[in-house]
């Protein structure tokens, strides 16, 4: 199996954090997908599901747009990952 571009078999580390923040806001994948369209960022529900399950990479502009829609700071999504690496 090719693990190029993966970390511990995952294509991203931010997906579960996105899911957690989305659920905290009581937002469905469908609502998130629809709200992203207002920012000209097209991430279908199936792709959001794959992101949240570490099965799809996430582009920098997608992370920023997701943070805007969730009304959180980008650092709220990134800090848990930074802290994980600090502990290594």
Regions found by a protein language model. Name each.
Residues 1-25:
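A short, Lys/Arg-rich alpha-helix, primarily the initiator
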Residues 3-8, 68, 75-88:
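Short, charged recognition helix plus adjacent turn
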Residues 14, 25, 41, 56-59:
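Flexible coil/turn residues that form the inter-helical turn or adjacent wing/linker of helix-turn-helix
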Residues 18, 29, 45, 60-63:
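Helix-turn-helix DNA-binding elements, focusing on the entry/boundary residues of the two helices
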Residues 21, 35, 51, 80:
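Residues in the recognition helix of alpha-helical DNA-binding motifs
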Residues 26-50:
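Short alpha-helical DNA-recognition segment
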Residues 32, 62-70, 77-78:
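Hydrophobic micro-packing sites on short alpha-helices
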Residues 53-65:
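Short, basic-rich loop-to-helix N-cap that marks the start of a DNA-contacting helix
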């Amino acid at each position: 199996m090719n693990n190029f571009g993966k970390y511990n078999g995952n294509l991203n580390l931010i997906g579960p954090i996105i899911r957690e923040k989305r659920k905290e806001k009581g937002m469905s994948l469908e609502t998130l997908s629809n709200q992203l369209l207002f920012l000209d960022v097209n991430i279908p529900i199936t792709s959001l599901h794959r992101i949240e399950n570490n099965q799809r990479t996430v582009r920098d502009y997608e992370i920023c747009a997701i943070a805007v829609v969730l009304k959180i700071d980008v650092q709220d999504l990134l800090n848990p990952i930074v802290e994980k690496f600090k502990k290594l």
